[in-house]
Amino acid sequence: MPNGDRTGGGRLQGEGWDRPLPERPLARKATPLDKDLKKIARLERATVETARSSTRIGIALLFILAVCAYVALKGDAFDNTAIVLVAGVVGAYMALNIGANDVANNVGPAVGAQALTLSGALVIAGICETAGALIAGGDVVATVSRGIVDPAGFADPDALILGMLCALLAAALWLNLATWLGAPVSTTHAIVGAVAGSGIAAAGMDAVNWPAMGKIAASWVISPVLGGLIAAGILLIIKFTILYRPDRVAAAKRWVPILVAVMASAFSVYLVMKGLQRLWKPGPAALGLIGLGAFGLAWGAVHPMVTRAAVGLDNRRKSVMQLFTVPLICSAALLSFAHGANDVANAVGPLAAIVGVSSSGTVAMQVAIPFWVMLVGAAGITLGLALFGPRLIRTVGTKITRLDRARAFAIALSAAITVIAASWLGLPVSSTHIALGALFGVGFLREWLDRRRKRGRIRRAQPLPQWAADGLARAEGAAELEDMLRAEKVKKARKRRLVRRSHLLSIAAAWVITVPMTAVLAAGLYAFARAAWAG
């Protein structure tokens, strides 16, 4: 091949290359018609999106109206039907917001790893959330959430009704804002902060159990750190036992059944401790037997399935990822069931308290949750997920860090293990914070491994190609130039980020301000409503 080099005059110099470079065709200048067509296309897209948004809002309003109609039909059962009607509207609004915000953590990783389509995730999450709420959601809830407020502050029935109504509305408004901003937050923390704010407005600062609030503040750090560390550890185990092995398929046949059995064991204990805690509270020995039994059953069922599925797979990472598909779908379903069993009752607790006081006329520390109240919570969450959940599901699944099925499996398994470990240690944790902490932990582990790998490659840099070496040899200061190029490569490798910092900062900020913001909002609503009520 003839030698040649490129000069600044737009010609190639050398034997056989002494000719002008071909001229690039100039881009056609946009005409007024092109600009008008682009404007019309943008207008059409905006019109379609507006129509879709209007349809979603219309369906949500129909659900709220259906709740109103039901409460109106049961009006004879309440001392103050108007208050229960308002509470039903706010409770339905709250349930819609929980579905739009809080459920994304359960199915987002599976969608991001392409183990589930968005439609499939919505169907599975909706069914499992509803089943968890109605089957294992429990029938009793504390009137004043989690011992945050001294019950004496709500000794008057009117004060309790007003406080719970303001707490419910404040938490719902905050969840709505967080969803609009694209920040997944803890429903339980929103309710706790709102109840605390109502308690302060009703009985002063002394009414709040500040040590309990301190534990909740500690969970802002404990939950994501624990979730992230455990998820990163699980992913490292998967990498070193399967993905880094010369024969990945053989390693996967050995280790995937074990990992799935660990997941089944963890979720069995998780569901008993978290989802069924109001129905049954087993001791450590019973939990251990449940975990061992689930491990054995799962391994016996999964091992032959994985062996059959591995037949014909080539020794590529992408092929091995297929073996994690079914376990990942099952984990998303189990997480949704456990969330429905635990968090739905917490969300409708204030509504149940209002209904209980309106029915009996007295204040009780615990009230029974009527079936229709639990149904409002379950149906509202499912509908909110279907109508408004896809945005946050995409954020959790695709916009924070890139996920494959092994990473998503590590996140799901971490959520169950972290909750169990925290419960045994008596640490306050949030399932929402754990799931997102696990997601960030996996992303930061990817960054660390990527930088470590790239620094190793740069240190073992191969000789430059001959054409580049010849050019550098003719340049003044060739050694310095080569050092500069390699230093620039190191700098770029260090700067490469696999976790989007903008999402990290916005989500962390939303976590920190959820409790104080809902408290301030609830206190303001309570003060305003109290003044209007008295007037």
For the regions a protein language model found, what residue spans apply to each?
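Alpha-helical transmembrane segments and immediately membrane-proximal extracytoplasmic
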Residues: 2-535
